[in-house]
C-alpha cells in the first residue's frame, strides 16, 4: 500500500509528471486551556505598583548570589525587581491552586521542564564541542539565553491554548516574565549557588 493510499480520504494529488499539487486537509485541531494562561491573565488585571518591597519577601538564599553564580546579566533587572511583582504572582498562583488543587506545582514543574530541555540541548551541543566544559560553565555562558528560551516556550504554550488568545501582547510578555522571575526565585530556572 502506498502512502497516498493510506491518506486517500484526507488528501488528493492533482497534476502531471512534472507538476504535482497536493491538497491536504488538516486534522481537526482543538486548543486546550492552559493553567499558565490563567495566571498571566490575572496578573494583567492587577496594578503592580502597590507591592511590598522585596525585603518583605523571604528567600532561603541570597538572590544576588544566585544571579552572580549563574552570570545573569540581561534579565538581572527583572529578577531584582521581584519585590514589585512577586506577591502578586504568589497570590495568583495560590488562588488558582485553591480552585484546582496542584495547579501551582504543575505550572512550576512545566517551567522547570522547559529549563531542563534547554540544559539538555546545551549538553548535546557541548558534547559535539572540542572543548569539554562542566555543565555549570555551559549554563553560566548561556544563562540569559536560557531564561529567554523558557520565556518563549511559555509564550508558545499560551498562544496555542484556548484561553490565551484574547490577551494584549504587553500583558502576555510582562506576565510571562513575572512568572519566570518567580520561577527563578523558586529555583525552577537556573542553578542555586553551592554553599
Predicted regions and their residues:
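Long, low-complexity intrinsically disordered regions enriched in small/polar
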Residues: 1-34
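Charged, helix-prone or intrinsically disordered regulatory segments positioned adjacent to compact structured domains
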Residues: 26-48
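Long, low-complexity, intrinsically disordered terminal regions
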Residues: 41-195
Amino acid at each position: 500500500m502506498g502512502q497516498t493510499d493510506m491518506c486517500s480520504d484526507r488528501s488528493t494529488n492533482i497534476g502531471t509528471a512534472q507538476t504535482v499539487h497536493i491538497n491536504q486537509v488538516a486534522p481537526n485541531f482543538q486548543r486546550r486551556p492552559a493553567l499558565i494562561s490563567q495566571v498571566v491573565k490575572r496578573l494583567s488585571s492587577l496594578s503592580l505598583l502597590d507591592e511590598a518591597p522585596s525585603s518583605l519577601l523571604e528567600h532561603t538564599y541570597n538572590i544576588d548570589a544566585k544571579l552572580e553564580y549563574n552570570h545573569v546579566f540581561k534579565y538581572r533587572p527583572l529578577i531584582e525587581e521581584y519585590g514589585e511583582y512577586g506577591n502578586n504572582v504568589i497570590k495568583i498562583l495560590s488562588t488558582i491552586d485553591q480552585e484546582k488543587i496542584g495547579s501551582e506545582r504543575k505550572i512550576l514543574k512545566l517551567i522547570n521542564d522547559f529549563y531542563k530541555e534547554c540544559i539538555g540541548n546545551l549538553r548535546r551541543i557541548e558534547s559535539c564541542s572540542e572543548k569539554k566544559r562542566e555543565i555549570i560553565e555551559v549554563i553560566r555562558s548561556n544563562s540569559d539565553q536560557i531564561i529567554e528560551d523558557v520565556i518563549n516556550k511559555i509564550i508558545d504554550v499560551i498562544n496555542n491554548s484556548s484561553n490565551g488568545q484574547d490577551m494584549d501582547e504587553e500583558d502576555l510578555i510582562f506576565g510571562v516574565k513575572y512568572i519566570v522571575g518567580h520561577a527563578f526565585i523558586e529555583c525552577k530556572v537556573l542553578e542555586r549557588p553551592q554553599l
